[in-house]
């Protein structure tokens, strides 16, 4: 399989800030917060060598938190030689402690832990200047820095940490015991921005316009004089990816919409209408619903379904090249893979494989195309911003996420035509009611799930029913890395439930999924 080309950040966007991951659950969130300060960032494992870091030519380093104690056997360590590179460095929680230790400070298990909301007292310095002297922050630590390294000013304290923040302006080094990246630290983004812009002197160049220009140039360089084919799913990711490539190579891009029979109601017509109107791109629709359903027959394992869908998806493209595109030489396949897709599929160093994404881990080894993934390093909010920069309408860029495998992974059990019809009707009702209630912008997405192998007893009129349950999974999120269930008003839930059980005969029960991520993923499969 061709290796995807990562974003060349040495272009108009500039060099990256590297977030060194010490095992923190918030490492990806830190990267997002750095980007919100208009600075490009990437996450690297703490095992990355100093030579590798030098080769990346970063503008600064951010050391993440982590679950270990600096004194525990096998705990992640920091090579003091890192500070000889002369780079600005910002330590967070464990990163703050390991930074202090490497520079000659003292870290101890004081017996006073702080978890959750904590009051921070600002003692001076520049990191917290012009912010409240007493402010709430989010702490999560057992060990604490008890003595700052020589040359560092202690600039904040808390009840459980006499040294809750320190800084050395001359060396452009700073650190905090708390978590500035989480929403529970109200001034955290200002503090992180102050380090990036004031301490490190980094400009705010990670803007939608610069991102779009850099990605267009990247695609133009990768494809050269070649031709590309892009699969449209109806979602924002594939639409923005296609729009970028279309800007780069013009009519040498052909977009293919694979109607795999796993779509929601009205989806095909919407793609054929909205996307073509917005981009004027060449669009070919391939109807392969029967092929997909035959391949999925008898399959109930979620991973099996995802991989089959990924494999059939590519085969549909190869068929389009042969049958629809008149034998033209198509060398490149464009996909809307995002950074969270790569992370969940185990594409980041040290990450576990949570699930295969059909456009990451489900591709066949004998792939006939070289992959072009212009969005591979972007989060969803960045994709939407780039889409707006490219002039795509809100109907496309504001659309709630919908997985490439479609309704195939929203049926828990075997995928059949009848089950798809049942789920499609229930999904359409839920979407109609959420839109009518004005909740589209408050909900990240609302998967509607059919528990196809589960039945429960009900009663309608004077008759006993034995129907399937439908699960509503409304969630709120910023980037799909974490999510919380959305508190949809009860009256809206009631309308959805009443309509589904009245209008979809196979369903006699509607339930609400109130699980956050973690522990549950957004999609059930």
Swiss-Prot record:
Q: Which UniProt keywords apply?
A: ATP-binding, Glutamine amidotransferase, GMP biosynthesis, Ligase, Nucleotide-binding, Purine biosynthesis
EC number(s) in its UniProt entry? 6.3.5.2
The active site lies at: 93 (nucleophile), 179, 181
Extract one GO cellular component term from the record.
cytosol
Give the reaction(s) catalysed.
XMP + L-glutamine + ATP + H2O = GMP + L-glutamate + AMP + diphosphate + 2 H(+)
SUPFAM superfamilies given in the database record:
Adenine nucleotide alpha hydrolases-like, Class I glutamine amidotransferase-like, GMP synthetase C-terminal dimerisation domain
Q: How does it assemble?
A: Homodimer.
Q: What is this protein called?
A: GMP synthase [glutamine-hydrolyzing]
Q: What class of enzyme is it?
A: ligase
For the Glutamine amidotransferase type-1 domain, which residue ranges apply? 16-205
List positions binding ATP.
233-239
């Amino acid at each position: 399989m061709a290796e995807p080309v990562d974003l060349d950040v040495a272009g108009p966007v500039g060099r990256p800030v590297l977030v060194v991951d010490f095992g923190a659950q918030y490492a990806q969130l830190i990267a997002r917060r750095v980007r919100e300060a208009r600075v490009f960032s990437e996450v690297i494992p703490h095992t990355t060598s100093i030579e590798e870091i030098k080769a990346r030519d970063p503008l600064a380093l951010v050391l993440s938190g982590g679950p270990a104690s600096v004194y525990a056997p096998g705990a992640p360590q920091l090579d003091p030689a890192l500070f000889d590179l002369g780079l600005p460095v910002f330590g967070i929680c464990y990163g703050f402690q390991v930074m202090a230790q490497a520079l000659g400070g003292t870290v101890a298990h004081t017996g006073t832990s702080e978890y959750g909301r904590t009051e921070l007292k600002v003692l001076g310095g520049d990191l917290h200047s012009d912010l409240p002297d007493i402010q709430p922050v989010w702490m999560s630590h057992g060990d604490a820095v008890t003595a700052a390294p020589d040359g560092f000013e202690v600039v904040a304290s808390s009840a459980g940490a006499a040294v809750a923040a320190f800084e050395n302006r001359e060396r452009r080094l700073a650190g905090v015991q708390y978590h500035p990246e989480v929403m529970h630290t109200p001034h955290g983004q200002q503090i992180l921005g102050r380090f990036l812009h004031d301490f490190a002197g980094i400009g705010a160049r990670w803007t939608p316009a610069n991102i779009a220009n850099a990605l267009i140039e990247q695609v133009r360089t990768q494809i050269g004089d070649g031709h590309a084919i892009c699969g449209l799913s109806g979602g924002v990711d594939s639409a923005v990816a296609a729009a970028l490539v279309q800007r780069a190579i013009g009519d040498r891009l052909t977009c293919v919409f694979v109607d795999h029979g796993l779509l929601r109601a009205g989806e095909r017509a919407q793609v054929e209408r909205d996307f073509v109107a917005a981009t004027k791109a060449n669009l070919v629709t391939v109807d392969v619903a029967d092929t997909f359903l035959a391949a999925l027959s008898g399959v109930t394992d979620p991973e099996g379904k995802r991989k089959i869908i990924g494999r059939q998806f590519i085969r549909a493209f190869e068929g389009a090249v042969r049958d629809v595109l008149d034998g033209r030489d198509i060398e490149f396949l464009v996909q809307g893979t995002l950074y969270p897709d790569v992370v969940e599929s185990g594409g980041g160093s040290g990450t576990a494989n949570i699930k295969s994404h059909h456009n990451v881990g489900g591709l066949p080894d004998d792939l006939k195309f070289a992959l072009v993934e212009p969005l591979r390093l972007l989060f969803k909010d960045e994709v939407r911003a780039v889409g707006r920069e490219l002039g795509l309408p809100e109907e496309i860029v504001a659309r709630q996420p919908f997985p490439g495998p479609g309704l195939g992974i929203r049926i828990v059990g075997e995928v059949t035509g009848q089950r798809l019809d049942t789920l499609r009707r229930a999904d359409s009702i839920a979407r109609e009611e959420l839109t009518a209630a004005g909740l589209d912008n408050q909900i990240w997405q609302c998967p509607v799930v059919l528990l196809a192998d589960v039945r429960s007893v009900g009663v309608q009129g004077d008759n006993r029913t034995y129907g399937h349950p439908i699960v509503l999974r409304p969630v709120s999120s910023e980037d799909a890395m974490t999510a919380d269930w959305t508190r949809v008003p009860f009256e809206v839930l009631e309308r959805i439930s009443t309509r589904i059980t009245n209008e979809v005969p196979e369903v006699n029960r509607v339930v609400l999924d109130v699980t956050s991520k973690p522990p549950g993923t957004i999609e059930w499969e």
